A protein has these predicted regions:
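Surface-exposed loop/turn and intrinsically disordered segments
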Residues: 2-198, 203-211, 217-242
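Juxtamembrane/interface motifs at transmembrane-helix termini
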Residues: 90, 248-251, 449-452
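Short, surface-exposed linear segments at secondary-structure transitions and domain or protein termini
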Residues: 93-97, 238-245, 391-395, 438-444
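Extracytoplasmic
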Residues: 113, 135, 153, 163, ...
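Contiguous, well-folded functional domains in the mature portion of proteins
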Residues: 158-160, 170, 177-180, 189-243, ...
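Catalytic cores of peptidoglycan-degrading enzymes
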Residues: 307-454
Length: 472
């Protein structure tokens, strides 16, 4: 018998080893395959979230950030007929799919109740390798008929760069309506026409920067995006706008232009380059801000009668003057002057042209200290280069109330008032609104509910007087 006991090496049973291998394999496989078994279903969003479908497109966005999309189908059932909008299978999963649907583009579609059904399945191995599925079903109404409009009263003549007004009716399904010309839109509002609460009244312009050949169109759009258009017919009276040249001096550039540049580095450049930057970039920023402010108006008329020119004032510069700026006798830039420059004496009291509400007070770049009044239904007046401001935002203003005093803030070359009139963000000819006869002939009859025939007769030029020679 040996003095020392010897033990045999411990062996793992083959079954245990096999089990370990299987578990390890499953763990490794699970690590790599787990994402393929993800349970996050695809997402489906509809924009806009509307219950009608017509001309306006409905955008369907299907996404899956996990395994990716494997298939997307979309159908639209209307009156027992099913229209296939999409039926796609993807060999390689995709993360996003966009579909655009417009009822007006579906051949043979009928109006009435409809059901939109979108089904999306991803490439996951979950659900016995079928993947995750999302189904969205939405009840809609198919509407491809545009609203109706009826023109009640319009203008026979409109000045180039000036304003016009119309009265019209639109069917109850209308959600937006007004006048479109070029890239500009002038919405109509209800409740302005005497004894006709359902009639729309719209002020609009034939802007100075829109070609005379451009046609104004009355448009009405419903919830489904269906649009009715009616051409407005009027004679466009030519208005000749001046061209002028302004010679820039070093003193003006250093004392007036350079301080308007906020960037210290930019102020160090050549003075003519600084001017061009101010005249282009800063002017555009300021005019964009004015346009944004003067596109948000109260839907009620706040003014009464003709607008008042600054008392005792002299016109120094006209509306839509095309100005060429020169430096050392060389043209370096140009711009349109979208208002009237009025001067009296230094620090002269600036009066409100008509009753309204203050919607802006403060510094406005090249315009300096500025007050903007909202007179309702898209009509605004602007008062710039003020040395002081004596009203506050939101304040109700009476005609001839003092707003501030004239000055030479901003890009003003001397003490004066820059006065502008705006319609829905568009600068228009101010002199019309100073003219009591123009308002009496073109605006007030429409607000009084007079017929188009009556207005046309009032606007017609007086017949020429003729003298017959007696025969011998």
């Amino acid at each position: 018998m040996n003095a020392f006991n010897s033990e045999k090496p411990r062996r793992f049973p083959a079954f245990t080893i096999l089990l370990i291998i299987i578990v390890a394999g499953l763990a490794i496989g699970g690590y790599y395959l787990a994402p393929r078994f993800e349970r996050n279903a695809p997402q489906i969003t509809l924009t806009p979230d509307s219950d009608v479908l017509g001309v306006a497109p409905l955008e369907i966005v299907v996404t899956d950030q996990g395994a990716g999309l494997k298939s997307v189908t979309a159908t639209l059932s209307v009156g027992g007929t099913e229209h296939n909008l999409a039926g796609e299978q993807y060999a390689e999963p995709v993360k996003e799919k966009k579909l655009t649907v417009a009822a007006s583009k579906i051949a043979g579609i009928k109006e009435g109740p409809a059901v939109l059904r979108i089904t999306a399945r991803d490439g996951s191995l979950w659900g016995f390798f079928k993947g995750n599925e999302t189904v969205v079903q939405k009840n809609l109404t198919i509407d491809v008929t545009p609203p109706t409009v009826e023109l009640i009263a319009d203008d026979r003549y409109i000045n180039f760069g000036g304003a016009g007004a119309i009265v019209y009716k639109a069917s109850p399904d209308t959600v937006t309506s007004g006048v479109r010309i070029g890239d500009y839109f002038f919405p109509g509002t209800k409740g302005q026409v005497k004894d006709q609460p359902e009639h729309f009244f719209a002020l609009f312009a034939h802007p100075y920067n829109v070609p005379g050949s451009a046609k104004a169109v009355l448009v009405a759009t419903d919830k489904a995006g269906n649009t009715r258009e009616m051409a407005l017919v009027y004679e466009l009276k030519n208005v000749k706008y001046r061209k002028s040249t302004i010679a820039l001096t070093d003193s003006f550039l250093q004392n007036k232009v350079v301080p308007l540049v906020k960037d210290a580095d930019a102020r160090q450049g050549a003075v003519k380059d600084v001017f061009v930057a101010v005249n282009k970039r800063l002017r555009k920023e300021n005019e964009d801000k004015i346009a944004a402010i003067t596109r948000k108006s109260t839907p009620a008329i706040l003014w009464n009668g003709a607008f008042a020119q600054l008392s005792n004032s002299k016109v120094e510069a006209n509306f839509a003057d095309e100005r060429t700026y020169t430096y050392n006798n060389q043209p370096i830039d140009s711009a349109y002057h979208v208002g009237y420059d009025l001067s009296v004496t230094k620090r002269y009291p600036v009066e409100a042209a008509n009753s309204g509400r203050v919607v802006f007070t403060g510094d406005l770049g090249i315009y300096g200290n500025t007050v903007i009044l909202d007179h309702g239904v898209g009509l605004f007046t602007l008062y710039s280069h003020l040395s002081s401001i004596e009203v506050k935002d939101g304040e109700s203003i009476k005609q001839r109330q003092i707003l501030g005093r004239t000055g030479e803030t901003g890009l003003a070359g001397g003490d004066h008032l820059h006065y502008g009139v705006y319609l829905q963000g568009v600068a228009v000819l101010p002199v019309e609104w100073w003219d009591a006869k123009w308002i009496h002939d073109n605006i007030e009859p429409k607000l009084e509910g007079r017929s188009g025939e009556e207005i046309a007769k009032a606007q017609a030029p007086a017949p020429r007087k003729t003298t017959r020679k007696r025969g011998r």
